Regions:
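Hydrophobic transmembrane alpha-helices and immediately adjacent juxtamembrane helices
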Residues: 2-19, 23-322
């Protein structure tokens, strides 16, 4: 027995005079409409793919341009991305090891891990904040997605962070291979594979802040000055230099009663959770659990949603203020 769809094609209903019935033309018109709909859908998909390819090309070109401009006429060039965190680590280790004497094992590695990750966030958000204003001449001449510019600055900061990991790995290698036996660090191993997950959290979080700041700074230029003050205070409220274990910090605090307030602040400090995550996988060799991953993801998605909302609400008016 033939399938039903074969019977429908093979047997054509005829009218009284042997011609096609009136409904036949209706079936043909329906088939033509379906074909046109499929063609339009395919054209739409191709157009979206082309837009995506163009956007990725623009992002790649902008990141390359910024990278070349940053190291133009520099003798050491890209090596500064490695030397900067090393020099900062050396200075801060000297200061905090002699003045405050926090009981933190492998303090130079502890310090550089906190420094490079916090620097990623501050560089990404600070660059994204001024991206729309810096691209004002281009936005007035070319029709282009405005969110490309804040996103590009975040990706550029991510590239610099990946280069600074060379310095982190160098310090880690020292403690793993050359440190005295009593203070030698065990190689973290498989926990380091969680780094891409952490970077997704931090990049998404930074994109959210960057979108909001880039939109607000177009209308209120004071935001660009205020953000520097905010990040400085944020840096000191985050355990970059001091112990992330607040019980260790209590002995060094002039007023131990502040410990409870600080604990409450840290629970709502996204960078506290991201830096603890970073040290867990690189310094302590532990894989963060589900709860910590959900907290980090929640901060990232909440900030991204806020940034997208602010940016989409205001981007149509950018051209009037840049």
């Amino acid at each position: 027995m033939l399938p039903s769809h074969v019977l429908e094609v093979s047997i054509t209903p005829r009218g009284p005079n042997g011609g096609a019935r009136p409904n036949e033309g209706r079936h043909v018109a329906t088939s033509n409409n379906s074909a046109e709909g499929l063609a339009r859908t395919d054209a739409t998909r191709q157009a979206k793919r082309q837009v995506m390819k163009s956007t990725l090309f623009i992002l790649r070109q902008l990141v390359t341009k910024d990278f070349k401009l940053k190291y133009r006429r520099s003798v050491l060039g890209v090596l500064w991305s490695v030397l900067n965190p090393l020099l900062m680590m050396a200075v801060l280790t000297l200061v905090f090891s002699n003045m405050f004497r926090f009981p933190i094992e492998h303090y130079p590695l502890y310090l550089i891990l906190g420094t490079v990750l916090f620097t990623l966030m501050t560089d990404a958000t600070g660059g994204a904040m001024s991206s729309i204003i810096d691209a004002s001449s281009l936005l007035k001449k070319v029709r282009i997605k405005k969110w490309v510019f804040p996103l590009e600055r975040v990706l550029f900061s991510l590239v610099n962070f990946l280069l600074s990991l060379v310095a982190v790995l160098g310090v880690m290698a020292f403690f793993v291979l050359f440190a005295p036996a009593e203070s030698r660090l065990a190689f973290p191993g498989a926990s380091m594979l969680m780094l891409p997950v952490l970077l997704v959290y931090v990049v998404v979080f930074s994109v959210g802040i960057g979108l909001a700041l880039s939109a607000l700074s177009v209308f209120f230029r004071d935001v660009m000055h205020l953000w520097g003050v905010v990040t400085t205070a944020w840096n000191y409220l985050t355990p970059v230099f001091w112990p992330q274990d607040l019980a260790q910090l209590a002995a060094s605090m002039p007023n131990p009663q502040l410990l409870g307030a600080l604990q409450a602040v840290e629970q709502f400090n996204p960078m506290y959770h991201y830096i603890v995550y970073f040290r867990d996988i690189f310094l302590y060799g532990t894989v963060p659990g589900l709860q910590e991953n959900l907290v980090c993801l929640g901060f990232a998605l909440a900030m991204l949603a806020l940034g997208v909302l602010v940016f989409c609400k205001t981007q149509s008016k950018f051209i009037l203020y840049i």
